[in-house]
Amino acid sequence: MPECSLATADSFSLVQINFNRDSIAAPRLPEWLRKGKTHFEAVHSLKIELRRKGLHTVCESARCPNIHECFSRGSATFMILGNLCTRGCGFCSVPKASPGKSQFSLDPDEPQHVAEMASEMGLRHVVITSVNRDDLADGGSHHFAETVRKVRAALPQSKVEVLTPDFCGDLTAVARVLDAGPDIFNHNMETVERLYRRVRPQAKYPQSLRVLEFAKKYKPRVLAKSGLMVGLGETVEEVHRLLRDVRCCNTDIATIGQYLQPTRRNLPVADFVPPATFDAYRDYGLSIGFRAVFSGPFVRSSYFADKVSEQASRVDDQ
C-alpha cells in the first residue's frame, strides 16, 4: 500500500483539533448566507427511514446547510463505511474514530440497504460517499464498489456518482471503485495547497491530484469531478492555481462553495466570499476548459449533483 500518514489500524486515535478562538474574531454572517429551515415534516420522515435501515448521510453528519432543502425534495448523499472517520480534518464535523469500538466494524448489509433506500426514494441520481477508513487494508474500496453494484442493480436507469476518499493514494482501490461502474467520479481537493496542513493534515495535495488524474486516465468516459471550499484564508490566485491543477488532470466538473464552521471545534471562517467572486471563479473555471463549474455560497460537492452532471454531459451534444 502507498505511504499513508496513518500507518496502522492500531495507531489511529481521535484527533482533537483546538483553536485559539480568543485571537480570532469570527466575521458576522452576511445576508446572502442566511437560509431558513422549512419542510420539517419531510425532513423528519426521511431521517426516520434512514435510521430504520441503519444508514447515514453526509448531509446530517457534516451538518450541511442545505439539508432541509435537499431532504424536502427527496435528495440525499449516502455516507457508507459507517459514521466514524479515521481522520481529523479541520473543516469536518463527521464523528472521529477511536480504536476498539464495536460500532467501527463494517455492516455487510449496508450496500443492499443503500440500494433499497435509493430505490424507495425513486432517485434518478444517486450520490455515494464515505468516511475515511485508513484502518482497513483496502481503505473500504471493496465495500464501496459493492455498494455501487447493488445500486446499479436496483436502479439500472439511474446515474450513480461516487465521492471517494484518497484511499491513502492506493490507485488499485480507486480502480476497484471505478470498475463497479459509476457515471461520475468525485474526489474533492477541499482547499488550496498552502492550507493543507491546517485544513487536511492527514491528506496530501499532490496525492489527491494523482487520484483525479488516474481516475480520468483509467476510465476516460466517466465524468471526473472535484470540489473546494473558500473562506479559509486562501487568495484568488491560489484558487485559480488549484483550478488549473485540477483541470490539468482532465477533470470535467468543479464545485466551489463557502466554508461554514459546523461546530466550535472546527476551523473558524476566515472570510465570507461575496457572490460576485463566486461568479468570477465560475467564469475562470469555464475559461480554462471545465465542462461545468457550480460556484456559489451554498454550493457543496453533491448539491444539485444531477443538474451539474447533466450540464457537463450536454457539452458532448453541442
Where in this protein do the model-derived segments appear?
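Alpha-helical elements of the RecA-like P-loop NTPase motor core of helicases
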Residues: 90, 197, 237
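Short cysteine clusters
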Residues: 64, 85, 89-92
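Short functional micro-motifs and their immediate structural scaffolds
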Residues: 69-72, 90, 94-97
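Glycine/Thr-rich phosphate-binding loops of Rossmann-like dinucleotide-binding domains
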Residues: 88, 136, 195, 264, ...
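Auxiliary Fe-S-binding modules of radical SAM enzymes
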Residues: 1-77, 81, 112-119, 146-157, ...
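Core AdoMet radical
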Residues: 93-113, 118-172, 177-213, 225, ...
